[in-house]
Amino acid sequence: MKVAVYGKGGIGKSTTSCNISIALARRGRKVLQIGCDPKHDSTFTLTGFLIPTIIDTLQVKDYHYEDVWPEDVIYRGYGGVDCVEAGGPPAGAGCGGYVVGETVKLLKELNAFYEYDIILFDVLGDVVCGGFAAPLNYADYCIIITDNGFDALFAANRIAASVREKSHTHPLRLAGLVGNRTSGRDLIDKYVEACPMPVLEVLPLVEDIRVSRVKGKTLFEMAEYQPNLNYVCDFYLNIADQILSEPEGVVPREIPDRELFSLLSDFYLNSTFTNESDGGYDHQDVPLDFTII
């Protein structure tokens, strides 16, 4: 099974991906996580360092695939999860989709692409071109990471459109949304009411999730000496269980941009004014999740 993880830049895709990979490994699966970002830091919390990228390795080998060995590009991370970083083209040049294609090509040459029970693609930021959507060409499922804010859901809607487009060529399905580090889910619920799709899990607003990224450790590793984090790990295990159940998923029908803007902004503003009329808080107390320009 192959799973592609998408979401707005900075939403916590890599942190979430690493913890899901560990959860899948805890369920007895052989897992490979492929980072698809020029920053090549997707697997940092699994390995504890920035591993060499496939593109860097191919350049050193002058693109002679026969000179590349699995140990040159595949690194064993925490919990037995294998890690690969695709890397990317130089800034302002080249195509991210080409890099993903070269990564898959090399893994096939090494007879590694089909050796895993689960391959998880952790993909950079928002989908802005066909190149960044390239991992969807190989995926059975897409998972979108979001929060309870306007911008993340706007990006999720764009990604849903890419899933629908790619589903025309192969049996790709959207497994669902994962809300990351949020204390509420009212906007998420409003969005999925208008654009039906599963919500796999909503992760709590726990500072240790963010801190784990800085420490270069997954929540599972931190929980070994901080048992109070075990309950957070259960959220990721629940996501893993849903993935392993091979859910039916959906082919989403995205909402037109202007309609989505009106839907979420009106809902947000109306709920704000309702709370104000009830004496809950005034304008200065409203926690803004987005800015209208």
UniProtKB/Swiss-Prot annotation:
GO biological process, one term: light-independent chlorophyll biosynthetic process
HAMAP family attached to this UniProt entry: ChlL_BchL (MF_00355)
Substrates-to-products reaction catalysed: chlorophyllide a + oxidized 2[4Fe-4S]-[ferredoxin] + 2 ADP + 2 phosphate = protochlorophyllide a + reduced 2[4Fe-4S]-[ferredoxin] + 2 ATP + 2 H2O
Ligand binding (ATP): 10-15, 39, 180-181
Binding partners and assembly: Homodimer. Protochlorophyllide reductase is composed of three subunits; ChlL, ChlN and ChlB.
Name this protein carries in UniProt: Light-independent protochlorophyllide reductase iron-sulfur ATP-binding protein
Pathway(s) this gene product operates in, as recorded in its UniProt entry: Porphyrin-containing compound metabolism; chlorophyll biosynthesis (light-independent)
One GO cellular component, as annotated: chloroplast
Keyword Disulfide bond: no
Binding sites annotated in the UniProt record for Mg(2+): 14
NCBIfam families tied to this protein: DPOR_bchL
Function statement: Component of the dark-operative protochlorophyllide reductase (DPOR) that uses Mg-ATP and reduced ferredoxin to reduce ring D of protochlorophyllide (Pchlide) to form chlorophyllide a (Chlide). This reaction is light-independent. The L component serves as a unique electron donor to the NB-component of the complex, and binds Mg-ATP.
Family indicated by similarity: Belongs to the NifH/BchL/ChlL family.
PROSITE patterns xrefs: NIFH_FRXC_1, NIFH_FRXC_2, NIFH_FRXC_3
PANTHER family: LIGHT-INDEPENDENT PROTOCHLOROPHYLLIDE REDUCTASE IRON-SULFUR ATP-BINDING PROTEIN
Enzyme class: oxidoreductase
GO function terms (MF aspect): 4 iron, 4 sulfur cluster binding; ATP binding; metal ion binding; oxidoreductase activity, acting on iron-sulfur proteins as donors; oxidoreductase activity, acting on the CH-CH group of donors, iron-sulfur protein as acceptor
Taxonomic placement: Eukaryota, Viridiplantae, Streptophyta, Embryophyta, Tracheophyta
InterPro entries named among the record's database cross-references: NifH/chlL_CS (IPR030655), NifH/frxC (IPR000392), P-loop_NTPase (IPR027417), Protochlorophyllide_ATP-bd (IPR005971)
EC number per UniProt: 1.3.7.7
Cofactor descriptive note: Binds 1 [4Fe-4S] cluster per dimer.
Residues binding [4Fe-4S] cluster: 95, 129
The protein's required cofactors: [4Fe-4S] cluster
Primary site of residence: plastid
UniProt KW keywords: 4Fe-4S, ATP-binding, Chlorophyll biosynthesis, Chloroplast, Iron, Iron-sulfur, Magnesium, Metal-binding, Nucleotide-binding, Oxidoreductase, Photosynthesis, Plastid
Tree of life domain: Eukaryota
